[in-house]
Amino acid sequence: MNPVRQPYDLAAPAPNGMRRGRTTGSCATAAVKAALMLLLDGVDADEVFISLPDPDFYLAVPVESVAWLDENTVRAEVLKYAGDDPDNTDGATIFAEVKLNSSGALRFLAAPGVGMVTQPGLRIPPGEPAINPVPRQMMRMAVDEVLAGRPDPGIDLAIGCVDGDKIAKRTFNPMLGIVGGISILGTSGIVEPMSQAAWIASIEVYVRVALGELPPAIAFTPGKIGRGYAADTLGLEKKQVVQIANFVGDSLDFAESVLIEQGRILDTLWVLGHPGKIAKLLDGVWDTHSGKSGMAMDAVAGVAADLGYPSELVAQIKQANTVENVVQIMNSQPDTRGYWMEIERRTAARMATKVPSVRQVAVRLFSMDGTPLGEAA
């Protein structure tokens, strides 16, 4: 553990007053660390410290149990805690079964309850367990911390979830081609409560703060993708960038209401993010949560058809697993900037109908790794 890291205070409420939680990635990382501590050092821990992706912080995570399964394997369990976020995995038992291997490599495996990726278009390739990149990085860091400079003998990390196959049925995983269980997720290690009415109300507060000093422009981002563009290219201050989660319609309504109160016209409202969320607006969807709206395959395929792309490509887009898969499909074409620019134009026009006090709504789309797709490319 890096001594300069500070403890992350999970008990401190989020800006909207709601409780934060631990991601499945943090839980799995804690289980890995606890299991490896017993396997290598004989330490039976009831709490472990894990390094968060933010280099300034570590997180203390209680360990529910840790025990030898056999003479070669240790299993540790951690309970998922989602805070006030309505997470299907809240209270689930996330576990890691850890043993040494002779390969000299760290291997990620799916234990019962964690799904396997079967289709392209996700951040993990087919044939791999549904453990996302950041949780994998966190687990690698935990392994390095326990090894503490000792040679790496090769370690198998089998990550699972009790009743994960049942929990997964209440998620988007079956439609995404993730079979057999849940995904191990998280980009920060911390669950920021985003889906309750209290979060929607907090968006109005953030919008008011963003517009409070009468700036000529602000930005909405469904997630973290696009924040760098807002700061580095658009020159927006942090407080002028509002993370709106899935609540596009509510956020636009709040912006219009505040602008009416201020009696002014906003020059530009930027909407920055991944087309997986934003393209749903082509279907007139204002709440982009996966539980309330489907994926926008027909709509993005329709744009391709309107632009005269070959019918075979249009059919391939329709059958894509995710919109990120569409990004990959379109990367095989010689010039797709115009395609994404048309999606930007159409979604911006749709949003503009809700904010007549905004002179220009401008959309900029980015792939999952932050690569600009349309106008910004």
Curated annotation (Swiss-Prot):
GO biological process: anaerobic cobalamin biosynthetic process; methylation
InterPro entries recorded: CbiD, CbiD_sf
Region described as Disordered: 1-21
Biological or metabolic pathway of the protein: Cofactor biosynthesis; adenosylcobalamin biosynthesis; cob(II)yrinate a,c-diamide from sirohydrochlorin (anaerobic route): step 6/10
EC number assigned by the record: 2.1.1.195
UniProt enzyme class: transferase
Keywords: Cobalamin biosynthesis, Methyltransferase, S-adenosyl-L-methionine, Transferase
Transmembrane domains' residue ranges: none
Reactions this protein catalyses: Co-precorrin-5B + S-adenosyl-L-methionine = Co-precorrin-6A + S-adenosyl-L-homocysteine
GO molecular function: cobalt-precorrin-5B C1-methyltransferase activity
Superkingdom of the source species: Bacteria
Family as reported in the entry's similarity comment: Belongs to the CbiD family.
HAMAP family for this protein: CbiD
Protein known as: Cobalt-precorrin-5B C(1)-methyltransferase
Source species of the chain: Chromobacterium violaceum (strain ATCC 12472 / DSM 30191 / JCM 1249 / CCUG 213 / NBRC 12614 / NCIMB 9131 / NCTC 9757 / MK)
Underlying gene: cbiD
